Amino acid sequence: MTNENKHSDCSNMANQGMNDASSARKGSITHVIFDMDGLLLGINTEKFYTEVQEIILARYNKNFDWSLKAKMMGKKAIEAARVFVEETGISDSLTAEDFLEEREEMLQKMFPTSDLMPGASRLIHHLHENGIPICVATGTHTRHFDLKTQRHSELFSLMHHIIRGDDPEVKQGKPSPDIFLAAANRFEGGPVDPLRILVFEDAPSGVLAAKNAGMSVVMIPDARLDSTYHKVADQVLKSLLDFSPADWGLPPFENASTKLN
């Protein structure tokens, strides 16, 4: 989800109820893992990638569409770059490596302006204050992570740990479960049983990665993403503002004002 206005008509959004398997886990969730791009950091972060990739493709008289974006989301940079040049048919003119180098120059100037998604701060503070161990598992490499989060250091300091895409334990990007299994291993007293972990994701490949790791997943997809990608998730919501911790046996928001902030 990309803006607060989308929350105002949430009643029009088709919310997927939790399936039998995920409902059976209600009350067993003890730890939470967050993706970052498009989930905690949103509007600008994803928009930046899209804008840069549109500029590059325009040189070849090609368009960057959502079917291509969906295939790239959540993957490691080099893996997404290969999808980009191969799916668009420009691999003979632009290598994946050259694409990344060109994209990097433009992104360096954009990332420091990244904004938080609606509901992100509220949920993270709530879980932290109630003693629920939380972490971030993002395909973003350290150099980009530092740029994207520099305005939000206080919020990210609440995380027990942060796993980035260039972590040595992450051999393969999403939809491989590597990054979520690495995250589970590093909680205090870890590894944590995947059945006790709830993951928040926006990307189809990230949802698959979490399910491949044996974890439950709440998906907060961009409204433009084809709904066929929603099917794998245990729950689909329009925004983090719509998440009810009590649905998963987590401490509920104490009052209405907390819930809406």
Regions found by a protein language model. Give the residues of each.
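Short helix-capping segments at alpha-helix termini
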Residues: 59-62, 89-94, 153-158, 191
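Active-site neighborhood of HAD-like aspartate-dependent phosphohydrolases
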Residues: 10-70
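Asp-based, Mg2+/Mn2+-dependent phosphohydrolase catalytic module
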Residues: 2-29, 125, 141-261
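Helix-loop "lid/cap" segments that line or gate small-molecule binding pockets
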Residues: 53-57, 76-92, 148-149, 183-185
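Residue-level detector of anion-binding/catalytic polar loops
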Residues: 63, 133, 216
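Short, acidic loop-to-helix structural element flanking the phosphoryl-transfer center
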Residues: 19-28, 108-136, 146
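A metal-dependent, Asp-based hydrolase signature
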Residues: 71-109, 118, 122-129
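Anion (oxyanion) recognition and catalysis
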Residues: 58, 128, 211
